[in-house]
Amino acid sequence: MRPPTTPPVPTTAPGRQGATGGLRKRGLRLTPEPGEGGGCSLEARGREEESRQKRRMVAQASGREETEAKENGKVTEAPSDEPQPGTDLVRKTSITNSESLQTVECSEFQSMAFLQSLAKEELVEGIKRRIQIKKCKSSENPPLKITKNEATQNIMVESQDELFKNTPKYSCNSLSPGVEKNCSFESHDFSFLHSEGCNNKNGFEDEPHGVCLHAEENSLKSKKENLRNLAEKDDTKTTKFLKTEKNVIASKLLLEESHLYQNKNNGLTSCLQSEKNKYSVEENNTGRKHRKKMKLSEKEEKGIDLTLSNVCNNSELVLQEHQIGMEGKETETLEHKKSFLKALRKMNHNTLPPVDHLCLPETVGKTSCRHSTNVVLQKTLESSLKEDTKNASETLGCRRLQPEEYFKSMTSSTVKSPSDSHPMGKRSPRGDLKTDTEESKVSCRRIIPMTGKRVWPLYSCARITAECWKKTSLSDLNDSLPGSLGNVRQHDFLMHQTNQTHLPDSKRLQPSLIERTIESSSKEVYDSELSSLSSVSSVEPTLLDIKETIPHDKKTKLEEPSRNGTEVVSSATEDIQLSNITQILTGNKKKKGNLSKLNLTVAPQESQEANNCANKTVHRKACITKQTLVAPDLVKILNTGRLTNFKIPLLKNKTGKRGEVSARSSEREAYSPLELLDSLSGVEAKQNRNKENICTTSGPQSLNIHSVTPGQTSSHTFYNKNSCTSPSFTKKGYDNKTCNHISETGNTISNKESLSIKIENNTFSCDLGYMEQSSFCSKKQEAFVPISSEISGRKMTKSISELKLGFPDILKAYEDDVLLIDVIQDDPELFGISSEGDLSFASEVSKISQEPRVSEEHPSADFKHRHLPGKKEPGDLSKEVALLDPGLLKLEICPSLSAAKEPQHDPKGAAISLEATEETVISENLEDLSEQARASDSDTKCVSSDKATVVEEQENTHEVCKSKDSRSVEAVSTECHLALGPNTLCSSAPPLTLSSHQDVAPAPWTNDFRFPGRYSVLQLQNPETCEIFKREKNFGVFQKPLGLMIPHRYCKLHFNTLRGCERAQCKFVHVPEQGDEKICMDVFKKYIRVNEQRLLHRAAYIFLEYYRKFPPGIHFSLQVLNDLLISLLKHCLLKEVFQVVQLSIMAKMLPALKILLKIFEYVAAMKLRNAVPALIEIFCKFIEAGMIPDPEHLNYIVKLLHQAQASQQEISAVLEAKSRLQVRQLRKNWTCDLDSALSEVENCKEKGDWTKLGNLYISIKMGCEEFADFQRFCACVAETLTEDYKEERPGVPFCEFAETVSKDPQYSEVDKTLLGRIGISAVYFYHRLLLWSKGRKVLDILYELKIHFTSLKGLTGPEKIAPRCQIVNVAAEIFIKSGSLDGAIWVLRESEWITSTPLWPCDRADVLHRHNLLCAIAHEILGKNLYKQTFEVLRNLPGFQNSQEAMGVSQSSLLFNELLDACIESNSLGISSSVADFMVAKSIPIDFSFLRRLITSLGRSCLWLKARAHYKSALSLGCYPPLEGNVYRKLLLVPSYLSEIEMLLAIEIFLVSNASSIQSPGAPTQVLQIVLKRCEESKPRSKDDYQAAVERLIMAARISDPKLFIKHMTVNINKEQVYSLEHCSAVKWLKENMKWAGKVWLFTNH
């Protein structure tokens, strides 16, 4: 099927035809007559010259209107029926009529305010230029086509006018709302006439949203009549308002409050009218059948009914008045625009358009299919109408009475509105005036009514008409400065129009947020326009393509495509954007050398989700991906040349995101607008939570670096709802020749673009370097002329270099075969992956989901490429995605090339941070850019540097990205190099956006460059889709294993894949555990062999994490460490090199000397001055660790430091180390020879210079490589130190020698060991000679140096094989002989009193010697009353510790009894009790008298537990007569020699033994007798002794607790006293003490 050569005749939908249909049928023109609309030119109210020019321009406009009306009559049809206006108001009114009226109301005040701000003096000169420009224009004016609701809209507008006339605030201006509206467009939108004429000649419609104007003729007449007062108002009020500008700003809030009530009343009227329209729309749109082929106009008007929301009719009335304003007052001149821009720049610093989001110049017309499917709907149509009307009326009411905001509203709404009218007509024969914007190209023309059927989207390649490919060219201009408004002429006007953007779906914006954002955006627009920098900055999401000519020869045209900064939630704008992309990709083929680069910035994720929902039907049929799809993706499909493989995206298994609806187009067969409305209900709420800025690239080239207007950014601006500002302002030059079409994928053309921006004498170099574009476009190389313009008193200069761009020939085939899609609309094979394995659009969209979510607090460019000095592009631990065109894409950023082509950079290494965000006000903050740029080194996430290389991607086994840039890298001295952070992050999005927000810790770099030839992908912030994508699609593609054998507990993605683990919280191990050092080595070897930058990053991370926790083991390989360091250096990872080297030095793993030299070479080559201090520190650590570089190495290091421009202090540090090493080297030269060293020892001995001998020891230790030779030297030293006995010298040689050695900085444990062994030899030597004092001095110095010699052996003589016991005995004996018992005990304690053990065997003689030595020590200590030390020595006698050494135990009994007696005498009951226990335990004979004395002393001291224990021990040893025979006979025999304590203990045993009988019921009849036995000793005892014993017995009964009572009974035959124990006291005692007494006396522990 061939596309129609001319667009089908638009017709209105059945049942919705209005007065417009009648007008069309009778062939009447829809626009008012010149006499009606241009009435302002009939009466001369100003100067005569001005009136004459006005009349002339009105006549031209009138002629244009008539001509185009005739043309329009030829191509349009009118329905037969023509209802009278007002007869069918409820049924035929538009869906959002009330909102349209509010929009008109808003635009009126905006227009009036701006008109009054124009300077009177600028009118004359502007009129002259205007006349000249008008002569070049077509005399045709676009006809206004009225399709519906004329009468209703007219009535509503007039009623709205009445409301405004009653407003006291505006009565002073004597202007009705209609007049104000006309004035607003007269003042600055005269530029529409230019673009309008050109577009009409070319048969294009110059409307961003593809919607035609609709207005009622009568309403237009009434409005244009009021224009006659405009000229007078202009001249008289301009100066007044300019003077009172600041006062108006200050009174803004007051005015807002005063008119709030009246505003709400106006909004209520609109709300009621919208309610009436709701049901009529639903009634008219039901029951319609889908027709496969329909006329273009029929589809358009039905598409309006389908999904057109409040914005549609809102735009109708606005553009009606816009058109009238342009016709009625054509005499406004070019100077108006200049003054307008100047005034606007000043005003936008403070305020914003109050209802800019409501003034949407969208109309119902030919290309309204863009709105038919993508307007953001509410959950139900009814709720949408109510909410829209309410919010619009409230917002309007709150803001309409702020006169200051009139000025600001012009920047984003009214100025742009004329570009919305694109009537169809014949192309103009004048080729030099073909100046239509990219978005004006005709796109899809098929619209389906609201019947639930599919709707062809705007950018469907199946519905492109032949006219859409017609090209126009910009006229050759000879102006020297395109930034000068006086020379820009029509193209500057066109850019001015299209720079303005729309904001549909106004209720999504909070007023405060909108004010801030629109203020910033409006300011950016006109500042950048004056500086010849194409800039787009606004909250509105409509993509506008701006063309601005920059003269560069007669044949040169510079088109400046600017893209809207962001995309707000509205899906309607997304369709327009994608439509513009399609038009640019296909429509520019015939344009001579001109191709605008489209730049599309994708909104936050929530906005994307909403847009995806609205585009469900679009993606199903038009084979276009979601909003994340950019033009290169479409180009990739076109370049393949295989339309049979043209895929429609499909994302199945959605995991819950409503925003992914558009990718599931195959799940449902019918998508009616009501269904879309329902599906989008959940997404609407998310539109208010847009917190992310995701900048992507759209258009023929997906990767471009643009000149950026410096701005200031604030982090909080990213929380604004639906507020996104374009951070890029671009200008590109194209040749005036036909594009070279290149079909093969991968063909890249390199071009350079350098940008130098000078701001207030601060020159910043923004080096945009080399850039290889995709094979889709190929352009002739052309250099831009420098552009200079003044912005708020500041000069900005831009030097843009040449660009190359190519188009493939496949566009021709694409244009011819656009209707092939029509027959495969429902083909299920279109969804999925092709047979060749190429990813379809669905999988391509899914590929985006692999990328992690960007932190919501910070904006980020989706495509960043970081660079460190080197040939390869360094990777960083942050995730990055390379945006690739279908071909191999290479973008290199090099130092900016001036006229001399020499690299230049900030001498301080400060990189400029070029940013533009929502709240950026460029003019106010240009002076702060210098500080901001320097702060960006540490604060920004993306830092621009002097050179960056984005390498082209190659697919290999390991997905290694190799850099093809073989050029030398410029040295950059910024701190980024020293810190080794990302030296350059170049956004591959159109703006060179360098965000100043670096708060988040960056996640590890785990993303790859995509394989060449695949479609470019963008970041999709959806981790759920990411998981699905990994699971189903490309897990194997992107995660190829490296072939490592990894244990199960380790993360295989982290260790065994190139990209690493992407899990947010991985349950597997990412760092090897202790004992898995072999795994570390294997991983390092593999990563080194692969030699990929990210793997080397990972290897450094694993090395640092592992060896910070665990010391190196047997599997550690020094060669692997060296190889790792070399690989890191090759990839310019200096930070990781420093970290690994420092850790290796701390862990005693010294890398090779060549590694250190290579580091110095790298730092010197890159001139990294800031890295020198850290490198010097590492060098010193190397020297301290024992590395001795050669003198030539040191000289080379000094040379490299000079090359790196190191300071003199740093170089001096190396020279000092060199001098020290030279001294050591000299010593090494003569000490490495062992013979010469030994001879030197003899010399020291002869001279008695033991200090020199110590220094010689240190030198030998540092220079000797063989430890055996060093031990031989130490033995020689030991012999030398022990052969000076012949000479009578007071000092001890060993002491001087040991002190010298201990002062060495390298003094270590090895030195302690050697000194201890030499000291043992000296001790033995003095022990043999009985030189106790000298021997003790040796022992003292060993004690001071904390050398544990007791575990060592000597170096020479018998002490070399002496057992440990012998060495300890010798040392202890020396201490004893020298009178130091403490020293002797210290030596014994140091040896842990060990004699002979399996580990330290010794002879019996040594054991006996130890026993005698200890006994001697105990005897001496006991004499000093040191009982504790004596007992410690005695209990460590040989034999007590080891039973095998049981010898001479009886010999030690005397010492123990002496110690026990001495302790009792001194009342040391604790030690005496311990001694008694030890003697009983070790069966050492104990003197009973000492034991009885101990028991008595313990009892008298109330230590009853110990007394009872020792009493039981004494009973068992036989110290007391046995009691068993008499106890149970109720008779107790008590010897008279016992003490009262012993008697009481005996009575206790007696009571416990007879407790059962005593406590029995018949016990009172029994008698317990105690007999005080006389002693049967040879020594006769006197009467007094026995009498004392009787008293002790009575005392024993009394001291018991409770007391016992005894009675004297009789005297037996042996004259022994017999006593009876009172029964009651015995019972009482048992009752209280039986528990513990039974345990103590009835149960023995022996």
Swiss-Prot record:
Gene this protein is translated from: Topaz1
Compositional bias per record (Polar residues), positions renumbered to this chain: 409-420
Regions of compositional bias (Basic and acidic residues) in chain numbering: 63-74, 429-439, 853-863
Biased composition (Pro residues): 1-11
Lineage: Eukaryota, Metazoa, Chordata, Craniata, Vertebrata
Region (Disordered): 1-90, 407-439, 850-877
Listed PANTHER family: PROTEIN TOPAZ1
Protein name: Protein TOPAZ1
Pfam families attached to this UniProt entry: Asp_Glu_race_2
